[in-house]
Amino acid sequence: MAGGIIQLAVYGTQDIFLTGSPQITFFKTIYRRHTNFAVESIVQHFIGDINFGQEIVSVVEKMGDLMSRVYLEIDIPKINLVKNSSNWIKDKSTAKNDYDKISNFYGLVYNYISVNTDLARKIKFLLSNNNISLNDISLIVLHNQFNSELDKAYTDLYKYINDTNSTDGFIQSQIPRTFNIINIFKSVYEKNLYIETNNPDEIGSIKKAELLKIINTRLYKQMYDYYIDIYRQYLSKKNIFESFENGTYEENYKFAWVEELGHAIIDYVDIKIGNQVIDKHTGDWFIIFNKLFTKIYQIENYNKMIGNVKELTIFDDKIKKSYKLIIPFQFWFCRNTGLALPLIALRYHEVMFTIKLKELSKVCYVEDNDDIVSMENLQSLYNINLIDAKLYIDYIFLDTIERKRFAQSAHEYLIEVVQYQTFDNIDHSKYNSHLKFSHPTKYIVWFVQPSHYRENPTGKTKCQWNNFGTSPDLTGQPLNNTHLRINSYERTDPNLGVGYYNYVQPYWYFISTPTDGLYVYSFSLKPTEHQPSSTLNLSRIHDFGIYLEFSKELSKIIESNCSSIFFGTYIMSYNILRFMSGMAGLGFQNI
């Protein structure tokens, strides 16, 4: 009897709870027929001056029946901060001298690496031959005639490095110490092995295997690592000299855009219906949402969309090419097609997006140079202005019957809206916040940052909008302790520790775990879903707050930079959006 038939036959009382009176089958796919529709992304243009620090407005054209996903596209300019030739560090004679030195050095390095590689290949061949003992191989390898060429190549290289007339800082640091194949062979050959056998053949075999392993796994990599840095330096000096020769040489100021530029460039964006603000998101919220909701396999692609790429964020004097930022909005109707905004039901009300962009100094930084007076001066001198910006809206087109139903019926949507509060100039070791929020709330997110992470008055320091930690690599906890408080009662246990809010809560309730310093607490069982699964009604709470105890690491940063602490907190809450008689409005107002 087949095993599967046996499994089918052994049916007991317990199985009744699983398969008694079955309601589904896994072997017959069913589906539901849907209404006829189409989706098209259509561009919308802005009213106002599209530039850093400006507010721009887009009134949504009612080209479709519903509005779903919305994307902001911003074209940032090419950055080429060429110094005045009178301020150049190099001239043609200096460039030629540098090129001559590195060229001679590179030739000696190339020769040394070539000879060393050739000898390593020969030694590897000898070691792989089982008919030659290690002692016989040593007689060949350690003979002067075998290694004289390598000795000469190393001597020439070492002499050049130590020659005071031909060295510079880079060359002087490039003495090769670890990958001379003769020295490696000699050290292994003469090494005492603390093993039980005294058989010279066995000892020789062990040492042969060790030498082959060193050659195959370590030697070639060490030679490559040594060579490649020198080769790059050689190419760099060569290109500089040749640019002097053909008249194309120029020196640039160092420059970089901040990380997560697509988020950082937004001060805020709000959506109004009939001149009533329905929801408002800040650049901080875009960063927070990304860290909690972006799937790990989407991060690389998403970073390209928002300009979080090395060619923009590395601080150097290379030209930064123009780049197209694509920033998806995260309003309720963007994340759920079942909540698509029914434009066809808004006969008398307009839908409008207002976007405030940050100033240039808050999204980039330049080298600390006395020739640079200010970021405003730099922006004017080099014409650093946005090229263009536009919205792309996914319009949904309905078939006749459904279109008529949307147009003539009243609608009531349960929507998710963001509320936030910020506090600045905090200079205590502990802080008890008092927050004013409204409506049934799914979850709360909070963070603290040194205020100077968010400021760049001179244009020469980097704003770290996405850094909620205490180190430049986004690590380190800025809080020692934190907990929630409701009407003077502790809503969460003070002894849970910051890791509970930074790691445990995101692990259980969200899609991604954020970087250090971003804390979250969910009042809902499934906060990532639109379906309510428990909330805290903050409209009924008289005193809601968060207790903060700052870490020593954060205090040191504040003290050393003469700064203060910025505290931000965001909640996701529910509200009702009603459509009736060609107009729309919120069911409940914020307190």
From Swiss-Prot:
One of its GO terms (cellular component) is viral capsid. Keywords: Capsid protein, Virion. It comes from the Viruses. It holds the Pfam family Capsid_NCLDV. It is found in: Virion. Disulfide bonds: none annotated. GO terms for molecular function: structural molecule activity. The keyword ATP-binding does not apply. The keyword Lyase does not apply. Belongs to the NCLDV major capsid protein family. This is Probable capsid protein 2. The lineage of its organism: Viruses, Varidnaviria, Bamfordvirae, Nucleocytoviricota, Megaviricetes.
